[in-house]
């Protein structure tokens, strides 16, 4: 299926690109989430009429993400969790826990912005965590997991 991208999509293209994707990906994800529209003549003309507006909106989102990235760059987040004698946690630290701690420090993030490629943390220690605020803005923060007293 041919679609018009309404915003930058990772591994697919930029705003305004007409790309061919599998039907299910377009119907079940891209179109319902507002990231794309079918590439019909009417939609192409409507997109060209709104192109400047969409580009301005995307630029505003990028500037906001960069501002939040500046606040987060180099920040150390500390989370206390119950742990056993050997340093293993009872439970784990997930991206939702980390996002909650970042929000408590004063920067708005979604839990989906926190990247944990190796899964949740299950031991006390210091970890580097990537926070992807935008496709072009990825910030690394320091996470310290302590045993709760």
Curated annotation (Swiss-Prot):
<dbReference type="Pfam" id="PF01281">
    <property type="entry name" value="Ribosomal_L9_N"/>
</dbReference>
<keyword id="KW-0689">Ribosomal protein</keyword>
<dbReference type="InterPro" id="IPR020070">
    <property type="entry name" value="Ribosomal_bL9_N"/>
</dbReference>
<dbReference type="InterPro" id="IPR020069">
    <property type="entry name" value="Ribosomal_bL9_C"/>
</dbReference>
<protein>
    <recommendedName>
        <fullName>Large ribosomal subunit protein bL9</fullName>
    </recommendedName>
</protein>
<dbReference type="GO" id="GO:0005840">
    <property type="term" value="C:ribosome"/>
</dbReference>
<dbReference type="GO" id="GO:1990904">
    <property type="term" value="C:ribonucleoprotein complex"/>
</dbReference>
<dbReference type="InterPro" id="IPR036935">
    <property type="entry name" value="Ribosomal_bL9_N_sf"/>
</dbReference>
<dbReference type="Pfam" id="PF03948">
    <property type="entry name" value="Ribosomal_L9_C"/>
</dbReference>
<dbReference type="InterPro" id="IPR036791">
    <property type="entry name" value="Ribosomal_bL9_C_sf"/>
</dbReference>
<keyword id="KW-0694">RNA-binding</keyword>
<dbReference type="GO" id="GO:0019843">
    <property type="term" value="F:rRNA binding"/>
</dbReference>
<dbReference type="GO" id="GO:0003735">
    <property type="term" value="F:structural constituent of ribosome"/>
</dbReference>
<dbReference type="InterPro" id="IPR009027">
    <property type="entry name" value="Ribosomal_bL9/RNase_H1_N"/>
</dbReference>
<dbReference type="GO" id="GO:0006412">
    <property type="term" value="P:translation"/>
</dbReference>
<comment type="function">
    <text>Binds to the 23S rRNA.</text>
</comment>
<keyword id="KW-0699">rRNA-binding</keyword>
<dbReference type="InterPro" id="IPR020594">
    <property type="entry name" value="Ribosomal_bL9_bac/chp"/>
</dbReference>
<comment type="similarity">
    <text>Belongs to the bacterial ribosomal protein bL9 family.</text>
</comment>
<keyword id="KW-0687">Ribonucleoprotein</keyword>
<dbReference type="InterPro" id="IPR000244">
    <property type="entry name" value="Ribosomal_bL9"/>
</dbReference>
């Amino acid at each position: 299926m041919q679609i018009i991208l309404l915003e930058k999509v990772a591994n697919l293209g930029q705003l305004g690109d007409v790309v061919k994707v599998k039907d299910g990906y377009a119907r079940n994800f891209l179109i319902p989430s507002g990231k794309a529209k079918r590439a019909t003549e009417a939609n192409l003309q409507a997109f060209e009429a709104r192109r400047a507006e969409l580009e301005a909106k995307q630029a505003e989102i990028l500037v906001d993400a960069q501002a939040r990235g500046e606040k987060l760059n180099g920040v150390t987040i500390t989370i206390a969790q119950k742990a056993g004698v050997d340093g293993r946690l009872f439970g784990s630290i997930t991206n939702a826990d980390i996002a909650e701690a970042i929000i408590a420090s004063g920067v708005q993030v979604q839990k989906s912005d926190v990247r944990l490629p190796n899964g949740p943390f299950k031991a006390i220690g210091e970890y580097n965590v990537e926070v992807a605020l935008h496709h072009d803005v990825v910030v690394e923060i320091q996470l310290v997991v302590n045993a709760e007293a």
